[in-house]
């Protein structure tokens, strides 16, 4: 993992972070292990945790978090790569003849595929179970990796939360930025997300990347067309389109 200080010179970014929580430099952080890059207001703390998927698989996860005054920022990475093994093993203990014991298509032994396909929607639903008012929900992409973004008002104190959920190389990315009532919207954090290839270089795809089993993986921009047999079996550069503040 590496970090460097990056001046925020873009006028749009300055408008997003100006006010009580503004500083001249943020930390540009990258994780080769989790294959992402983004900016934080300070070097993030890193902690390990676990995530229970929609179908009950307990998956390893890592949280990167930082604070700036009363504003809080976090990025959680959930590794869905073990999900096939975990859910297949889970199916072995089901009563004989039940649906979850059948290895037919995407049912039974194949439930892990639906767990991966629905991971973004499931993570999004967890935000909506909080005491919040959702003011905006939109499809989005970062460097042509598809995902979803949310804007929420927290009912308890009227603080604002901007969240984003993406999935790349079977790693679920959950970003969350919360600023107090009256502060500028914390949109710059979720829109700074980028991807890294196996060598740690910035990555942008030539067509839309969809992290799902049986879906062909597109070639990186500038690379040769992908082999049609190269699919995201096993579970699965800035340029995202930010939504309006609602």
Where in the sequence are the language-model features?
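Bacterial N-terminal signal peptides that target proteins for export
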Residues: 1-9
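Boundary at the C-terminal end of the N-terminal hydrophobic targeting segment
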Residues: 21-23
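A structural detector for beta-sheet-dominated domains
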Residues: 30-32, 39-41, 47, 67, ...
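Surface-exposed amphipathic alpha-helical segments
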Residues: 32, 36, 44-45, 96-100, ...
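Non-catalytic extracellular/lumenal accessory regions of secreted precursors
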Residues: 37-45, 50-57
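Short, solvent-exposed coil/turn segments at beta-strand boundaries
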Residues: 39-43, 67-70, 145, 166-173
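Conserved polar/disulfide-associated segments of primarily extracytoplasmic proteins
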Residues: 50-160, 233, 240-246
């Amino acid at each position: 993992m590496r970090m460097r200080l990056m001046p925020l010179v873009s006028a749009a970014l300055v408008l997003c972070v100006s006010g009580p929580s503004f500083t001249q430099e943020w930390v540009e952080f990258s994780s080769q292990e989790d294959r992402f890059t983004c900016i934080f207001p300070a070097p993030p703390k890193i902690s390990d945790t676990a995530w229970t998927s929609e179908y009950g698989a307990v998956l390893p996860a890592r949280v990167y978090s930082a604070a700036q005054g009363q504003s809080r920022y976090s990025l959680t990475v959930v590794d869905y790569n073990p999900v096939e093994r975990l859910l297949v093993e889970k199916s072995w203990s089901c009563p004989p003849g039940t649906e979850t014991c059948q290895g037919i298509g995407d049912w039974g032994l194949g439930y892990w595929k639906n767990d991966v396909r629905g991971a973004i929607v499931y993570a999004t639903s967890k935000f909506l179970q909080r005491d919040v008012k959702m003011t905006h929900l939109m499809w989005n992409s970062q460097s042509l990796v598809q995902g979803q973004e949310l804007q929420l008002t927290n009912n308890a104190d009227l603080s604002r939360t901007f969240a984003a959920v993406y999935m790349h190389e079977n790693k679920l990315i959950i970003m969350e930025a919360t600023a107090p009532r009256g502060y500028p919207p914390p949109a710059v954090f979720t829109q700074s997300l980028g991807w890294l290839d196996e060598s740690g270089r910035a990555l942008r795809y030539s067509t839309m990347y969809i992290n799902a089993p049986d879906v062909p993986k597109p070639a990186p921009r500038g690379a040769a067309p992908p082999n049609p047999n190269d699919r995201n079996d096993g579970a699965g550069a800035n340029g995202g389109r930010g939504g309006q503040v609602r």
